[in-house]
Structures are given as C-alpha cells and as structure tokens.
Amino acid sequence: TEEEIDWVRSKEADKGLPGKIVEASYFGYELNNRQEADFETVGAELKTTAADYDEATARYKSGETISVTQIDFRRPVETDFYASHLYDKLRMLIVIFYHRDRTLASKLLYRVFFASLFRPSEEDIAIIKSDYREINRKIRAGQANTLSRSDGTYLSTAPKAKKRTNMITPYYGGERVVKRSYTLRKEYVNVILSGYYTRREPEEHLITDLHELDRMGFAQIVQGRFSQYVGWDIWDIVGTLNLHAEQTRDELGFPDIPVGVMNKATLPVITARMLGLRSLKCEEFTRAGIIVKTVFFNRHGINKEKFRLGDVDFMEIYNAPAPHTEMETDDDGNEEEVYQTGWEESELFAQLDSIKYLFVVFQKDADGDIIFMGSKLWAMSDEDIEEARQDWMDIKSVLTHGVQLRIGNDGRTYNNFPGVAEARCIHLRPHGAKAFYVNADGTSWGNGCISDTEPLPDGRRMTRQSYWLNNSFVRKVVRDLITVE
C-alpha cells in the first residue's frame, strides 16, 4: 500500500531495512522475534543478509554476521543444546543474500542475487555446540557481562542494543547487561555464500575426533596441540618434527639464528606440524576466519611486528554520515532512538568484527636461543572494537577538516593522520614501497605512480594507506605468554 511504501521510505537509514522488506513483502511476514523457527512445518529459519562485491577476487563476500536468536538472560539457560531455541533455528536456514552496493542512492535499489537452503554439517554442529556450552558456562557463572564478540569459534554473541538503556538483570546474578544475541560469525556466513560458486575442494580437518569437543572447547583443543612444545628451543621442535636440511636465515624468518638445519621448515610448516596439520589451510580455520600470525619478541619483551588489516578507502570514511541521532526499529518491532556514526557500516568494522587471530609466540632468551612461548586464539572484544571506533573517528576527523601534507628535511612526505604513538590500537601507514602524491592542480611528486594512490576528498591524491594493528596492542594481547628481563 502507499502507506507501507511511505513507511519504508522513512526508514532508509535503518540498517536492517533490506531484510525487513524481503521478509514482509515476499514472504508476507510481520516483524517478529519469536523463539521458534520461521517455517515451523519444515523447521527452517529465514535470514536475509548483506554481501559485498570484492573487486580484487571478483567474488561476493559476506558483509555481516547473522543474528540467529536472542539470548534470554532473564531465564535459566537450556543446557541441552539440541533442546535449545538456538538449535531449533540453526538446524536449517533459508539465507537470502542481497548485494550491498554502496554506490546506489537508496537501499531500496539493492538486488537480491542468491538464496540458499543450508544445513550445518555434523562437524559444524559439534563446534557450534561446544561454543554454546562455553557461552552458557559464563552466563551460569554470573558472568554474562563478560560476554563478547570474541567468544566462540563459529558461534559468537553480539549486543542487540545500540545504547546502554533498559539494562537487564541476569537470572544468574552478576552485573546488569545489555541485550545480546547468538550470531554466526561473518566468515562462517561466507561458507553459506560459497554455494553461489562452484564448490571448493574440502581442506583437511584439525579435529578428526568430534568427541574431543565434548570434553573441551575449540580454543582448548588448539592450545592442547601446542602445549607439549611450550618452552622448547625451536631447533628441538624442528628435530622432533623431523624437519631437516638447509634453510637460509632470512627464509626462516629468524635473521639471528645459525643456518643449516631444516628442509621445507618455514614457520608456517613448523606451526602446522605442531598442530598435526600438513598446512595451515584447514576447514576449521577457514570457516572461523582464523588467521595464523607468528609474533617474535626480544629478550626485553619487545616486538616489532605490526599486522596489516587492509587498504584504506578515504572516500568511504569521508562519506560516512556525520554522528547523529535517529529512530530505528528493533527486532521486536519497537522504535528506539539510536546514535549513528557510520562506524558499523564501515569496511574497517566489517574486518574487525570477523577477524580471529591465532598468535604463535616465540621469544629470544638470554642465551640467544629462540623459545616457543605458547599460543593464543584471539578476537576483538567489544572494548577493543570501541577503541578501534575511536581511532576510525579520529581518521574521519582529519579527512573532514583536511589532510595536511608536508615534505620534511629528509625528503619524506608527512601527514597529520594519528601515528602509531597516538592511536589506541589501529593506525595508518603505507603498505607498499612506492610513494606518490598529486595536488589538485595536477602537480605531483614521489617515486611511484598514480596507481599507488587513493583520492582525497579535496581532489588531491596521496599514497595508498593500510590499517595496521599497533605492535603495542599485539604485545598487550599476548603479554601473559612472554617474559621481560
């Protein structure tokens, strides 16, 4: 009806608008947040979600997590996973993907391009069940306030409220909490989306005995694989794993160690062998979006590595809406006032919301030996995401008020974006070796070319930048694994 069309147009800013339109117009649904599956007869749950098009790979990729069902903090948890509302909704999903084309003037122009009837595999259900158990362990211990996006391997939790109003007193006690829902991680949603393309060859599995997941969580299993090697010199690990012959110091990644012991024993191979894998490409890591990173510390507990996240699109940040308040409809159909900054629609948020690192930590001791210190499976917590948001807002402020470029006495070009010393956890710096700058009048300088640049809002161009995790931030994450002399 005209009235319904007018209502839809008034909700243009609502992040969930495309999904609500599909569910209401195509399936005739009223907005609901029922605990039962949407199609009760066949036990299927309907989900509509965004996908972005990656020009580099010429493929669609998942644009967000999928919220499966709300966590009811006011009631006792269901300890039997198979009797839970989560399993009821998760066992069969109808997932509709639409292309989130940010170049279009309206969300109403987004195009639906793929629908999938998806059943999680037995292996996936085993890991999700383990995630569910670990999340509920926190809730039952009165620690619901410690739940975070970093929980879980395939299944996580995410806050439902945009502001801390209507806080809930949990059934099991502890601090009051905001609404949260069980969510499927973005990389797992990519597994569903991969059905749009030719099916890929399966990778090897880290977990071959699913009963392991009845005894411990995925993170504990990973740590268990590494635990026998903690405190070992790297050469003892190499010998035990039977990785012999010659390798240059630079190829190995340890410039200070003597040459001469290994065959095909690059760090990824050493790490994979400790895990019992042939390579670091395994099904569990792919589906959870786990990236393995080796971190080196000197005897004083200092690391040099800064981890690159992805390239920066200055115009995407600049064009994000200015901070403002607007009305949005929640999953219960109620309107609430929310504070919008454009952050949750940004490329950086999309990366950080899905990223999960397996940090493999080595440290040089007083004798100069390289010791394996342990591992940590880590994802950004809600608090970390908030720090990153503040860094992103600082970058946006520079773009809004003007990027300043200055040529120093050393001939290098400096800018006024916050540096690693000012940033909380994320800073900008170039990824490539080439630098190039173009003024609005067409004059240019640098040792690169136009393809090494990104446009600025005022018509100039500057060397392409990337987001990087601060080395001090990484140090804070793994500080319990290292020693400081």
Question: PLM ranges: what are they?
Answer:
Residues T1-G43, T48-E485:
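Nucleic-acid endonuclease domains
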